[in-house]
């Protein structure tokens, strides 16, 4: 719970009692005059940042923006810098840094402003542009993938937000990152894998491939692959089996179903490459594994998989809109 000193006093907590709570470690000070339960800062980094953002928003007439807005919108930002709370003071002065806050200045038109849990915050599309201007590519693309996958914004809205920030510092960087966004990614791990495999040494991969047997029966859907080479790839994250759980299923049920699905792929002649978080440390090793798998198709006697396949189409708006503004 985030609360102000005035709210604590109104509830009968004296300044000396508040100091005792801080000294014992039950509560922490977020900014001057704003406090939170210490337990709320003991979770994941994004949760800690969210609590700090809510604290700053309680006493400041600011528009929460950039990576802090992404956290409020519930977007993943792996590799992003969460050491400071980011907000924008509209049209006043220059950027200001404090130990825990980065206050930007600039013009954010009303169409790119919204409220979330009573806090003024940039819209999802504008947030994605600001993140892409200021954070690593992985954080920017992962946030954009998640926003598109959850239908929190559209490709057109991102394009419009890019146009509105056309002259901003970092705009070319933002355009380059957001051109890579793809709402078919179902997890940050899938985004990372796709970016790692987007490399001159590898051909472009397809995403969300539905595989069918010779009789047209659905076998399963793979995260990605190289269709001409008979290669599929699957990202195995910690949350994968939770996402696969059907009502009434246990984790064991999901694991067994996953094994049957992979067996179905291999019986049709597909080669399945598994990817997990250990690959994050050395992406070059993953690319070599994928190249080795692809090379199989050039060997004498290789036969393509039987059955059929279909690629889940990219969002319809992407077919009409180019993120090259």
Placement of each model-derived feature along the sequence:
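Surface segments flanking catalytic/ligand-binding clefts of nucleic-acid enzymes
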Residues: 14, 148-325
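Short gly/ser-rich loop at a beta-strand->alpha-helix junction or flexible surface loop bordering the NTP-binding
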Residues: 1-172, 206, 295-325
């Amino acid at each position: 719970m985030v609360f102000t000193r005035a709210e604590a006093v109104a509830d009968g907590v004296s300044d000396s009692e508040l100091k005792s709570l801080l000294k014992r470690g039950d509560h922490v000070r977020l900014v001057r005059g704003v406090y939170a339960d210490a337990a709320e800062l003991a979770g994941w980094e994004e949760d800690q940042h969210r609590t700090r953002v809510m604290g700053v928003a309680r006493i400041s007439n600011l528009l929460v923006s950039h990576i802090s807005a992404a956290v409020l919108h519930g977007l993943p930002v792996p590799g992003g810098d969460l050491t400071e709370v980011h907000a924008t003071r509209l049209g006043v002065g220059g950027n200001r840094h404090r130990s825990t806050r980065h206050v930007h200045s600039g013009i954010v038109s009303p169409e790119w402003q919204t409220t979330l849990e009573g806090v003024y915050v940039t819209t999802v599309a504008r947030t994605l542009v600001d993140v892409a201007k200021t954070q690593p590519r992985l954080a920017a693309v992962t946030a954009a993938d998640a926003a598109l996958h959850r239908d929190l914004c559209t490709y057109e809205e991102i394009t419009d937000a890019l146009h509105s920030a056309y002259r901003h510092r970092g705009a070319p960087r933002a355009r380059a990152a957001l051109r890579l966004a793809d709402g078919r990614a179902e997890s940050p791990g899938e985004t990372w894998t796709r970016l790692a495999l987007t490399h001159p040494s590898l051909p472009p991969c397809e995403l969300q491939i539905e595989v069918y047997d010779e009789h047209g029966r659905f076998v399963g859907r793979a995260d990605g692959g190289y269709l001409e080479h008979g290669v599929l790839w699957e990202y195995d994250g910690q949350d994968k089996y939770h996402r696969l759980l059907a009502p009434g299923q246990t984790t064991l049920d999901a694991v067994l179903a996953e094994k049957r699905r992979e067996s179905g792929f291999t019986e049709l002649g597909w080669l399945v490459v598994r990817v997990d978080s250990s690959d994050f440390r050395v992406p070059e090793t993953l690319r070599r594994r994928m190249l080795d798998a692809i090379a199989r198709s050039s060997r004498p006697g290789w036969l393509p998989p039987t059955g059929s396949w279909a690629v889940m189409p990219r969002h319809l708006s992407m077919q009409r809109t180019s993120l090259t503004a």
